[in-house]
Regions:
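Pyridoxal 5′-phosphate
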Residues: 1-178
Length: 178
């Protein structure tokens, strides 16, 4: 949850990294070099205030809802994993992963093709491809097909999981008949 482009960096004085981006600080604009004190030494340019505020809201929401949210994610993700195991030609790559991320492929079909079908014919959004991890895909043997990645959130329902599984079952069946 939150806007892309924002995160946190936690460290202690012994592991304090050296700044790698330099530029105006906004707090000490008269200096030609980055300030030496934290956090200013790590804050080059204009801060992404909307993303920072959104991240703060996401953290607050998670602190209030995290336990129930995690239980819902686990329930829906496990339903998806167990359902995918029953569909011929579906290869799941995240069986032992306890998160809400489920990655799979269908036979030797392109993950992009599967993603497009899910989007265009079923209105289901997933990610496809190599997910910025080409070496992982080489290790897994999926560098040619990529993987379909489902990201389950606490707002997803079992009904949505079954709709998704029904769509994958139809797609896999159609791909087998080609």
């Amino acid at each position: 949850h939150g806007i892309q482009g924002c995160g946190c960096l936690c460290f202690n004085e012994e592991s304090k990294p050296k700044p790698i981006i330099f530029g105006g600080t906004g707090s000490q604009s008269n200096l030609l070099l980055q300030p030496k004190d934290s956090p200013d030494c790590f804050e080059a340019g204009t801060l992404n205030t909307p993303a920072i505020l959104a991240l703060g809201e996401a953290i607050e929401w998670h602190s209030e809802n995290g336990k129930n949210n995690h239980a819902q994610i686990e329930l829906v993700a496990n339903t998806v994993k167990e359902g995918l195991k029953e569909i011929p030609d579906v290869h799941i790559m995240s069986l032992k992963n306890p998160s809400g991320i489920v990655s799979f492929r269908i036979g030797d079909s392109s993950s992009d093709k599967i993603s497009d079908i899910l989007s265009e014919q079923y209105g289901i959004a997933v990610r496809s491809g190599l997910h910025c991890a080409p070496l992982c895909h080489k290790f897994l043997g999926t560098e040619k097909t990529g993987l379909v990645r489902v990201s389950v959130s606490g707002q997803n329902t079992l009904k949505e999981a079954y709709i998704f599984l029904n769509a994958i079952e139809h797609i896999a069946k159609n791909l087998r008949s080609q």
